């Protein structure tokens, strides 16, 4: 069986360095808020081209804390609206409602699955205060246009970069476009820890200072609490492991991009919709880092069964949109036909930096041999 993502083989590439990092942390006797965290925050800031990185416990906390910090600064308040695409993973919406804000779920661009600038503009009201573009599946959103729109309407922009590590437009990385960004380092991400981890990036010094406190019980100095904060700290061990893996992110990105190109050039089945036209991709390679390679078909269950029978593991990202989840039942009557069509048709096939040429060819052959009997 070709695994959807072989985390063991990915991390085995760096096992000596990862084990050295573990030993270094163990021997240091300092396990929370130490030099490993400082080093990773510094290196990740350099990687993203930003002034500040704030390590936190996970990607959801990253988004939640940015919105919370803007509330502390008086830039937003409970009841304000946040525009987000309706086909996102539920964490994007959870961060909004956790802060007493109102998610405005808008239809995505049917071709990119990302926020449509036209749909953002149509959704703006007097209560709109934030745009939350999710760079879904590894493709960065149309950030120059989104930032121009945000500037025109005086809106804040919070990038959800949980799936877009290393993506860029004109050399400017995801995480350096909006007023702030949230990253996840969940093990399956393109830059994955060996446990839960996350980070916030920003160029706003005032925002960063509040976030440094909010993640640590609302405190800059022990036992002096400025805010009603939380415990959301990126620990020393995960920071050390991430520092190792960050060095290789660029190479892994190129490998993913090469696999994606092989898929785009060679999967040819009228029953399967590919995520991009190959020429479109070749002209904008840096914009997609292929966290996921998501195809679409009206016959998803049959295709998934066919691929399984051919020894290929697949996953669905995502089977149920947020507005159809029980947690958000009050939104279930929303008319979002594009979103619902996407969730009914998408299927993710294997793409990972340790895939062999034989495995790639097998996936292509299996996709091309799919037929409706």
Question: What spans do the regions from the language model cover?
Answer:
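Hydrophobic/aromatic ligand-binding patch that stacks against planar heteroaromatic rings
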Residues: 95-96, 149, 173, 190, ...
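Short beta-strand-to-turn element immediately C-terminal to the catalytic PLP-Schiff-base lysine
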Residues: 183-184, 198-203, 243
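Conserved active-site segment immediately N-terminal to the catalytic lysine
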Residues: 159-194, 209, 221-226
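N-terminal "arm"/small-domain region of PLP-dependent enzymes with the aminotransferase-like
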Residues: 1-30, 310
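PLP-dependent aminotransferase-like
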Residues: 71-136, 140-161, 168
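Pyridoxal 5′-phosphate
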Residues: 13, 76, 256
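PLP-dependent aminotransferase class I/II
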Residues: 8, 37-42, 47-54, 60, ...
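Phosphate-binding glycine-rich loop
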Residues: 30, 34-81, 95-99, 105, ...
């Amino acid at each position: 069986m070709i695994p959807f993502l072989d985390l063991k083989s990915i991390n085995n590439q760096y096992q000596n360095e990862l084990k050295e990092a573990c030993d270094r942390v163990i021997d240091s006797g300092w396990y929370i808020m130490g030099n490993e965290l400082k080093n990773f925050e510094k290196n990740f800031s350099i990687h993203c081209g930003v002034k500040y990185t704030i390590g936190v416990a996970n990607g959801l906390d990253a988004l939640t804390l940015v919105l919370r910090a803007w509330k502390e600064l008086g830039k937003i308040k409970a009841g304000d609206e946040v525009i987000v695409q309706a086909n996102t993973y539920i964490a994007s919406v959870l961060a909004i409602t956790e802060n007493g804000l109102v998610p405005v779920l808008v239809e995505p661009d049917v071709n990119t699955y990302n926020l449509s600038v036209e749909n953002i503009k149509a959704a703006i009201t007097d209560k709109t205060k934030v745009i939350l573009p999710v760079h879904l599946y590894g493709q960065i959103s149309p950030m120059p246009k989104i930032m121009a729109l945000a500037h025109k309407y005086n809106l804040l922009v919070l990038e959800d970069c949980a799936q877009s590590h290393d993506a860029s437009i004109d050399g400017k990385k995801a995480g350096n476009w909006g007023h702030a960004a949230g990253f996840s380092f969940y093990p399956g991400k393109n830059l994955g820890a060996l446990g839960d981890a996350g980070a916030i990036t920003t160029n706003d010094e005032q925002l960063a200072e509040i976030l440094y406190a909010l993640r640590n019980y609302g405190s800059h100095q022990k036992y002096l609490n400025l805010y009603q904060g939380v415990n959301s700290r990126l620990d020393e061990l995960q920071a050390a492991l991430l520092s190792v893996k960050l060095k290789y992110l660029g190479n892994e990105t190129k490998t993913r991009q090469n696999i994606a190109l092989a898929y785009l050039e060679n999967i040819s089945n009228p029953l399967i919709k590919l995520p991009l036209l190959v020429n479109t991709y070749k002209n904008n390679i840096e914009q997609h880092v292929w966290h996921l390679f998501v195809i679409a078909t009206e016959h998803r269950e049959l295709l998934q069964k066919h691929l399984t029978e051919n020894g290929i593991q697949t996953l669905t990202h995502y089977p149920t949109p947020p507005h159809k989840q029980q947690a958000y039942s009050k939104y279930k009557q929303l008319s979002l036909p594009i979103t619902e069509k996407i969730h009914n048709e998408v299927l993710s096939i294997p793409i990972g930096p340790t895939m062999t040429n034989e495995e790639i060819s097998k996936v292509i052959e299996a996709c091309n041999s799919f037929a409706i009997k």
